[in-house]
């Protein structure tokens, strides 16, 4: 992180002590929000690239954007699957209701139940590499983390610190009465999703890289990623999928297809305890939203992982 940015962040953190009572420090592991904006609310508007300064800071922001959009290329040594950051945080981390960076950065440091401690923003990004990217977290002072932090900081220009902005999460989608139906989800997947992600959920490649990410299997996110939760995946799908047709699926259909997606095997949770899926389920998954880790589906135990 360059000196000017570090000084700015330090000043912000010191200045924020007096406002600590106003800043919500609740669990940031699993964000929820009601769909849409409240009366009189509007979404935060991040700055445009044309407004970037032509200096070292602007260059670092551009490098962070490049890593975010093409993580496979610019942070390859830390990625263990076929995902890019922008696969989950759409429109280069700008899109409201898709966990935008401008909604996340101002909320850190924050407590996360996932690792039971207050996390810095760098630690939050490291977690994405470990779970969503099924890779190795870059060091907190690495160029990759510094660049991604600078990009997030820049997108948050003008955003209030410690305030939950409208659009910062995936809007919560209520579970259908009677629960999800994996068989229905399979049919919906074939009709709505397979054209991009493939009949087998393995995505599509062009020029050696994925243009549509794999949704399960060895090149997808692992069992520790937030998207393995059916409720989180349903919220993402309802809001933004199929691509360009967000909101076209019913709440129930979003749940059904999310359950189908997450009823397939994927890379192991890196927090695996003593080689035991059951011990790992009890410690990390039993109270983590709605998920199928450690559950039997069609006679198979999910959570054994693929390599």
Swiss-Prot record:
Optimum temperature is 20 degrees Celsius. It is found in: Periplasm. Heme c 2 binds at residues 193, 196-197. Binds 2 heme c groups covalently per subunit. It comes from the Bacteria. It is an enzyme of class 1 (oxidoreductase). Keywords: Heme, Iron, Metal-binding, Oxidoreductase, Periplasm, Repeat, Signal. PANTHER family: BLL4482 PROTEIN-RELATED, CYTOCHROME C DOMAIN-CONTAINING PROTEIN. Monomer. Catalyzes the oxidation of 2 molecules of thiosulfate to tetrathionate, using TsdB as an electron acceptor. This is Thiosulfate dehydrogenase. It comes from Stutzerimonas stutzeri (strain A1501) (Pseudomonas stutzeri).
